[in-house]
């Protein structure tokens, strides 16, 4: 951590917002500042640049660029950064905080960023290009989508699910570090913020991939069910046409009835031949004639049935292929109760054996929402019985009737498989909704934190510009109060939508900013209006920390603002050269405040110059 005007060696140990209070006791010509965040140049734009954080949490883009401040690093920079981090051995927390490859900053390099060689076409392959930290734009939408999630390319569903746990673990560590660095007033807080945004972006991409995977699975299964239902309806229509061909009703064409009557008469004639040998010759001639007519009728029936049979076979072939794909997929995934034996049993159960055919039954199309145990089969001549005979002719005609029935019988029983597919569809739909909700939560949290960090960054840039144009602390208080109000509004909406991570991070940020406001109020004699505003913020912050403390065990607002927990905050509001240390180790700020009062009087009287 360095001083606001970094070239000096005062070692105030401050960062962020508190750097801007140090200008009261240092000359800008002798110091420089290391900035982490920025805000647009004019305080009048605070409302325009405040985070637009509503129920859908849309991403906010800047009204216009302010020089090069806020420019996002190229996407390849983050990809190489993640690749380098994945190849590194596991480090302890302290080693990880000081590992230059773990974050954008290079230690002791005047706040410069390391950019991969592929982005610098004018540099050598071994020397990285330097990228100034002021060129980071927290509010830029280019950050979203430029960071690749772990194992997101070519990975299966299990690897994506494992990445969710890994990213959530990394995110919890980043939030803990963010809280720790804020309390310690460490310059690594910007690194923690960037890690939070990076991991949130990666998590949102992984959850989006999981959501898309389950959505695709559900759509595939739904498409199969829709096709099966369509094919079953078409099959029902064809079977109805078959039934009409075989019908013996008066409104039918009479071929089936004719066939049955001819067969019966042939049998009766044969009986007459046995009883009346005197009429044997005439009856045999008649019998041959009836047989020929019966065979002709049989040929007509078979010809009419052939097209329908082929159409049904094509439909059932498509059904079988679709069902085989589903069963194979379920078996390969080893989900739930699925195994190879069950898959084989399901496929064998699809085929209807000829021995299962009866003469009197009806077929109905499949109902997707209801699974039945047995398949009803279409038949002919439900109310017609052939005459009994002791010779072979009766059995031959009976077999012919069964053959007709078998041709009109569907050969594929899809009821059990439809029930299984419907069950899998419900499970995939439930997973789809679950991960869509988690994806929305992470996306909203990411949007809220990116906008809040951008607001803090732009505010600090605005405060820096104030140090070069005014010595009035009212400008500081007004600008910081506006920033606190915007952050409190974002925190309130995060609480409304149960974005716990965003609430905790914003509570830490608001607490640190609030400590600076308290110190400004203690060091000046301005109106009570500003103090009232700070008190109002204090009350809301106190409630916020009371809720957050139950889950995260954060220190209370009183302990967070005491000199024991934030000594670097008070050091940041007064230069080391003008402060005095008491016997107990506390800092006396009266000397610095008196010096500021004298300088202020000289400037107002016009007797001194700016150097004085």
Curated annotation (Swiss-Prot):
Residues 214-296 form a coiled coil. Induction: Expression is induced by methanol and glucose. The keyword Protein transport applies. One of its GO terms (cellular component) is vacuolar membrane. It is found in: Cytoplasm; Vacuole membrane; Cytoplasmic vesicle membrane. Residues 44-72 are annotated as: Disordered. Interacts with ATG35. Required for the autophagic degradation of peroxisomes called pexophagy, but not essential for general autophagy. Involved in resistance to elevated pH. This is Autophagy-related protein 28. It comes from Komagataella phaffii (strain GS115 / ATCC 20864) (Yeast). The lineage of its organism: Eukaryota, Fungi, Dikarya, Ascomycota, Saccharomycotina.
């Amino acid at each position: 951590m360095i001083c606001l005007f970094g070239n000096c060696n005062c070692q105030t140990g401050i960062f962020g917002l508190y750097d801007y209070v140090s200008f009261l006791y240092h000359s800008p010509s002798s110091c420089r500042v290391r900035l982490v965040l920025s805000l647009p140049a004019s305080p009048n734009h605070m409302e325009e640049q405040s985070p637009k954080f509503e129920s859908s949490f849309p991403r906010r883009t800047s009204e216009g660029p302010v020089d090069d401040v806020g420019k996002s690093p190229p996407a390849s920079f983050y990809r190489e950064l993640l690749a380098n981090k994945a190849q590194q051995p596991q480090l302890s927390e302290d080693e990880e905080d000081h590992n230059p490859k773990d974050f954008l900053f290079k230690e002791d390099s005047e706040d410069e960023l390391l950019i991969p060689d592929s982005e610098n076409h004018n540099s050598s392959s071994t020397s990285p290009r330097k990228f100034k930290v002021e060129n980071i734009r927290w509010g830029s939408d280019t950050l979203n989508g430029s960071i690749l999630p772990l194992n997101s390319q070519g990975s299966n569903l299990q690897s994506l699910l494992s990445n969710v746990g890994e990213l959530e673990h990394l995110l919890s560590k980043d939030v803990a570090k963010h809280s720790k660095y804020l309390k310690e007033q460490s310059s690594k807080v910007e690194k923690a913020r960037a890690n939070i945004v990076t991991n949130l972006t990666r998590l949102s991409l992984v959850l989006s991939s999981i959501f898309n995977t389950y959505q695709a699975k559900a759509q595939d299964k739904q498409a199969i069910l829709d096709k099966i239902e369509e094919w079953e309806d078409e099959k029902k229509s064809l079977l109805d046409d078959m039934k009409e061909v075989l019908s013996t009703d008066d409104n039918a064409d009479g071929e089936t009835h004719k066939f049955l009557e001819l067969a019966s008469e042939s049998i009766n004639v044969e009986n007459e031949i046995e009883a009346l040998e005197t009429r044997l010759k005439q009856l045999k001639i008649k019998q041959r004639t009836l047989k020929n007519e019966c065979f002709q009728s049989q040929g007509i029936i078979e010809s009419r049935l052939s097209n329908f049979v082929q159409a049904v076979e094509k439909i059932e072939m498509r059904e079988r292929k679709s069902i085989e794909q589903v069963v194979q997929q379920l078996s390969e995934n080893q989900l739930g109760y699925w195994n190879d034996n069950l898959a084989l049993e399901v496929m064998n159960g699809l085929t209807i054996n000829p021995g299962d055919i009866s003469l009197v039954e009806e077929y109905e199309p499949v109902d997707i929402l209801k699974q039945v145990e047995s398949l009803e089969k279409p038949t002919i001549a439900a109310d017609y019985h052939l005459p009994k005979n002791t010779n072979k002719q009766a059995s031959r005609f009976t077999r012919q009737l069964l053959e007709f029935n078998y041709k009109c019988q569907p050969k594929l029983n899809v009821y059990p498989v439809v029930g299984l597919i419907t069950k899998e569809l419900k499970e995939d739909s439930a997973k789809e909704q679950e991960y869509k909700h988690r994806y929305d939560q992470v996306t909203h949290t990411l949007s809220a934190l990116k906008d809040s960090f951008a607001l803090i960054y732009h505010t600090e840039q605005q405060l820096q510009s104030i140090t070069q144009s005014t010595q009035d602390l009212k400008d500081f208080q007004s600008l910081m109060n506006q920033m606190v109000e915007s952050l409190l509004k974002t925190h309130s909406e995060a609480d409304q939508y149960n974005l716990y991570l965003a609430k905790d991070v914003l509570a830490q940020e608001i607490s640190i900013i609030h400590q600076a406001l308290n110190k400004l109020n203690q060091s000046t004699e301005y109106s009570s209006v500003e103090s009232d505003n700070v008190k109002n913020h204090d009350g809301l912050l106190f409630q916020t920390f009371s809720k957050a403390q139950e889950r995260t065990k954060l220190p209370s607002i009183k302990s967070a603002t005491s000199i024991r927990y934030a000594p670097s905050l008070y050091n940041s509001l007064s230069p080391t050269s003008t402060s005095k240390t008491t016997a107990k180790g506390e800092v006396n700020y009266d000397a610095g405040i008196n010096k500021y009062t004298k300088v202020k009087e000289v400037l107002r009287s016009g007797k001194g110059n700016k150097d004085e």
